[in-house]
From Swiss-Prot:
It is found in: Cytoplasm. Belongs to the SecB family. Its main location: cytoplasm. The keyword Chaperone applies. One of the proteins required for the normal export of preproteins out of the cell cytoplasm. It is a molecular chaperone that binds to a subset of precursor proteins, maintaining them in a translocation-competent state. It also specifically binds to its receptor SecA. GO terms for biological process: protein folding; protein tetramerization; protein transport. This is Protein-export protein SecB. Signal peptide: none annotated.
Length: 156
């Protein structure tokens, strides 16, 4: 009964999704357009979160895409997609998962669309990023944190 009451008190809502920062660079254009297109795509991603008020959090998903063609940078695109979320009455582990995996999963399609649009506006072939398993990334992060804590010498 107590679990049911606690579950009813938990709440989650999206307050706002916004573009926080964007950058597109094509340092080797227009000569890049004259080469055969055989891209090497590198994706880096990162998430950050901070509390804005009681139960209100900002989560920022940063995606950096670097595409090289014949060892030269064709373009570099960076997007910081932000969101403001209400996440109330959650246990610490639930909140960490919500901010570290669930919210980035919501933000990713927006960031992916922005990157795709920027790439097309740069007149490069369309880039469709594959979905990201943020749950798996979050679990890997928790495992690495646990291993670091286990390996750290304890103070006696």
């Amino acid at each position: 009964m107590a679990e049911a009451a606690q579950a009813q008190q938990q709440n989650f809502a999206i307050q706002r999704i916004f573009l926080k920062d964007v950058s597109f660079e094509a340092p080797n254009s227009p000569t890049m357009f004259q080469k055969e297109w055989n891209p090497d795509v590198k994706l880096d991603l990162d998430t950050q979160s901070r509390e804005l008020g009681e139960g209100v959090y900002e989560v920022v998903l940063r995606l950096t895409v670097t595409v090289k063609n014949e060892e030269e940078t064709a373009f570099l695109c960076e997007v910081q997609q932000g969101g403001i979320f209400t996440a109330g009455q959650m246990e610490e582990a639930q909140l960490a998962h919500c901010l570290g995996a669930f919210c980035p999963n919501i933000l990713f399609p927006y960031a992916r669309e922005t990157i795709s649009s920027l790439v097309v506006k740069g007149t490069f072939p369309q880039l469709n990023l594959a979905p990201v398993n943020f749950d798996a990334l979050f679990m890997n992060y928790l495992q690495s944190q646990a291993q670091e804590n286990a390996a750290a010498p304890s103070e006696a």
